[in-house]
Amino acid sequence: KINKLDYRLGISLTRFYYNQSGNDDSSKKYSVNPKATLHYTFSDNSYLRWKAEVFNATPSLSDLSAIEQTIDSFQIRRGNPNLKSYMCYRTELTYEWKKGIFYSNLWGAYDYRPNAIMDEKLQEDNKIVQTWDNQKDWQKLSGRLMLRVGPLWDMLQLSFTGGVNHYMSHGNNYSHTYTNWYYEGQASFNYKRFSLFWQINTNWNNFWGETLSGGENIQMLAVYYKHKNLRAGVGAFNPFTDNYKVQSENWNKFASYKTNNYIKESSRMFLVNFSYNFSFGRSFKTAQRKVNNSDNDLSLIHIS
């Protein structure tokens, strides 16, 4: 620690070895994975934290398999035994400020993965071959802002989170960019033994290679009652909407697709919850010391 600056350095070693049955060729690789964290405290109300790490990603056994699988009369899935492990570089920056009932958190990150193993589709005669290869690179820029206020009158708390993910996927035979905006809102109200909770979030989508994997857009409303060790509640998913969907897309030039999965039954789907806290053995009451001669709290708050 240097004045208000805390730092942490780490390093690890990874060994990857692969040998396919019936094949004399094998693959072995070592990688050094460093990690660093810097944390600067401006005051009791704010700090700035920077993190960076390098780690190794290895191909899965299914991707390495040379076996061909027939999907249908036009498509074949084929593994690639020549896949190589690759390095991943990630850095992120977080700024946090809080004062009284107000709290804010601003976060940004950048991911860079050269030679990333990603999907691709090739045309061979009258067939479409789906396989994997070490592509040029995959990059992701992310940003997120969280605002929270509460508790107001010791009863109400509100929070809002908005963010964006920008993907850049560069293959050997393709190049795609995709931007996904998302938000999440929460509200909770507590009065005596009752509590009311509401949450809404939009789709958080992921893009890798040529494939878009969609997240969920969902709302939830629930009310709970607590009496001693008993807690009971009733709630509903999507109580005000019926537009739940999960999308999936592939942007390949030979065999693209776009699907949207709708579940109308998720609209106004009710749930009931009961829980009881059982306690066994002795129970002890603890009191906080008024004077603490040591200070081990770095005021680190981890948000994922």
What are the roles of these predicted feature ranges?
Residues 1-304:
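Exposed, low-structure sequence patches enriched in small/polar residues
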